[in-house]
Amino acid sequence: MAKKFELRNGQKMPKLALGTYLAHGEDLFNVVDKALSVGYRSFDTAKYYENEKELGDALKELLPRYDLKIEDVFITTKIFPYSGENALELMTKDINQSLENLGRQYLDLVLIHYPRPLDTGDKDSRNATYRKESWLALEKLQADSKVLSIGVSNYEICHIEEMRDYLTIDPAVNQVEYHPHFQRKELREYCQINNILFQAFSPLGRGNKTLLNDSTMVRIANTHQTSVAVIILAWIMQGKNGVVAKTTNGDRAAENFKSVTLKLTDDEFARINELDLATPYVEDRGWEVL
């Protein structure tokens, strides 16, 4: 199984990324070290995580140990939409800061983190305008080669359809919560039809025991002599979806990477497809945002 997807602009993106939410200091450094050693070449961060510089510093020190350059890894960061009227100025400032933090001349992928700014409510009528201005600012930075690909996160079909009125560059990625108990079939099919890579975050439901102890997946994991986590990640990628798996445990990161080469049988894949409970396990509720 190929280890990369091709985005709509031809850019290659590794199927599995190491997520860095809540990772800082020695924990972040050590898990990045282990991840690089077993083959990870994609790392996911965000302005909101406040760890871009720590990730950049870790990569600067660690990449030479593995005979790698900064261009050999795919880096995603995410930025919330801006409230107010100066989105281009703020986006330019933030992207330049991210480039400095991460030691890059360009960013591989930047996502609009959520369909509203941090400082507005879900039902604020201005959210659509803030999304528009922030997206157009991101398009400008892609045109200026500061960013190779741009996309969204936590966007529903309505949010993407709304973009048709003003975009000149379609989103390359939509990153949302996705796992066997929350399969988002309609959104996933919409993204596939529109050549938007559907990328999962929180694929293990933030460690949700109902998900990880699901008897069907436990049996499949036992058959493959692996963990339920590896089965879930393999199922996601085998369904032609990208995935971000967050951990600060190096051994767990190494175990998760085995999913890149694990192949489920057609029957196993179908059995997991039947486990949808339409149940989100994290607090993000993009579908509630106007």
Residue ranges of predicted features:
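Residues at the N-termini of beta-strands
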Residues: S42, Y106-L109, S149, V173
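N-terminal binding-site loop/beta-alpha segment at the start of enzyme catalytic domains
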Residues: M1-V73, L204-G205, R271, E288-L290
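Beta/alpha (TIM)-barrel catalytic core signal, keyed to glycine-rich beta->alpha loops juxtaposed to Asp/Glu
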Residues: R116-L290
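CE4/NodB-like, metal-dependent polysaccharide N-deacetylase domain
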Residues: L90-I112, K140-Q142
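Acidic-and-aromatic substrate-binding clefts and catalytic sites of carbohydrate-active enzymes
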Residues: L22-E26, A46-E54, Y82-E89, L118, ...
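A short, structured active-site edge motif that brings together acidic residues
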Residues: K69-S83, L109-H113, Y178
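Short, acidic/polar
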Residues: A23-L36, N86-N101, C158-I160, F182-Q183
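Acidic (Asp/Glu)-rich catalytic clusters
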Residues: L7-R8, G56-I70, L99-R104, R164-L167, ...
